[in-house]
Curated annotation (Swiss-Prot):
Pathway(s) annotated for this protein in UniProt: Amino-acid biosynthesis; L-tryptophan biosynthesis; L-tryptophan from chorismate: step 4/5
Official protein name in the record: Indole-3-glycerol phosphate synthase
Species this protein is from: Verminephrobacter eiseniae (strain EF01-2)
Organism domain of life: Bacteria
Entry-linked PANTHER family: INDOLE-3-GLYCEROL-PHOSPHATE SYNTHASE, TRYPTOPHAN BIOSYNTHESIS PROTEIN
Class in the EC hierarchy, top level: lyase
GO biological process, one term: L-tryptophan biosynthetic process
UniProt entry keywords in alphabetical sequence: Amino-acid biosynthesis, Aromatic amino acid biosynthesis, Decarboxylase, Lyase, Tryptophan biosynthesis
């Protein structure tokens, strides 16, 4: 079945091959390894939790395959500043920036602009299928990467995490079901485990995905619920179940003031 994820992965492989012809792996790796002082992504999440607040990874996303254009008035730096400022003492812990251009209208430049405009740690949100992209993430300034279990085999999960760690980047490990969770936990050491409520093959969303998987999460891991968190009731339902970390994008991208929308959602 040629589902959405298959289409994205096929396009991404071609994109990476083209990128390596323009800038060889050796050059990207050298650039990545020359960079110092990543921002503490995990630490920023845990700091919010220690204050009794929700730890929010606020996403900067112009469009998506399922919803189309989310924000026409899109200035990554302004959105990042809005998230960092928040309102009434409620603000983002970290940022997630889409760098996939073909399906999400993202850009490496958006990540650079967002990171330069504030002090928050930044996650590169993309479909990483090749070690080249891990080095590329650090070279562009990312403090963390997303590894999607549905896109990677066991060896890749372990290898990509090891590369990220060698570059002092955090890893957010994304799963959607129990088999993915079991496989990923066996291969990766990162404490940050994202539970995506969106099925990447059908793009259907259900918060019960997170609720059903919490019991399977080892205590040393920090679950991050992702996708479909749109209302204060959604937040309450998840927090009542013990969820402390959230990745949210769409609800904020449609708002005139993303930071204010964040503060209201997590008030």
């Amino acid at each position: 079945m040629n589902d959405i994820l298959d289409q994205i992965m096929a396009a991404k492989r071609a994109e990476v091959a083209a990128a390596q012809k323009r800038v060889p792996l050796a050059a990207v790796r050298a650039d990545a390894e020359s960079r110092v002082l990543t921002r503490d992504f995990e630490g920023a999440l845990r700091a919010k939790i220690s204050q009794g607040q929700a730890a929010v990874i606020a996403e900067i996303k112009k469009a998506s395959p399922s919803k189309g254009l989310l924000r026409a008035d899109f200035i990554a730096a302004d959105i990042a500043q809005s998230y960092a400022e928040g309102d009434a003492g409620v603000s983002a812990a970290c940022l997630s920036v889409l760098t996939d251009q073909a399906f999400f209208q993202g850009s490496i430049d958006y990540l650079k602009q967002a990171r330069a405009s504030c002090q928050l740690p930044v996650l590169r949100k993309d479909f990483l299928l090749d070690p080249y992209q891990v080095y590329e993430a650090r070279a562009m300034g990312a403090d963390a990467i997303l590894l999607i279990a549905a896109c990677l085999d066991d060896a890749q999960l372990a290898d990509f995490e090891a590369i990220a760690r060698s570059l002092d980047m955090a890893v957010l490990l994304e799963v959607h079901d129990r088999p993915e969770l079991e496989r990923a936990l066996a291969r990766c050491k990162t404490p940050l485990v994202g539970i995506n409520n969106r099925n990447l093959r059908s793009f259907e969303v259900s918060l019960s995905t997170t609720l059903d998987m919490l019991a399977d999460m080892p205590p040393e891991r920090l679950p991050v619920t992702e996708s479909g968190i749109l209302t204060p009731q959604d937040v309450k339902t998840l927090r009542d179940a013990g969820v402390q970390a959230f990745l949210v994008g769409e609800a904020f991208m449609r708002a005139a003031d993303p930071g204010l929308a964040l503060a209201r959602l997590f008030a």
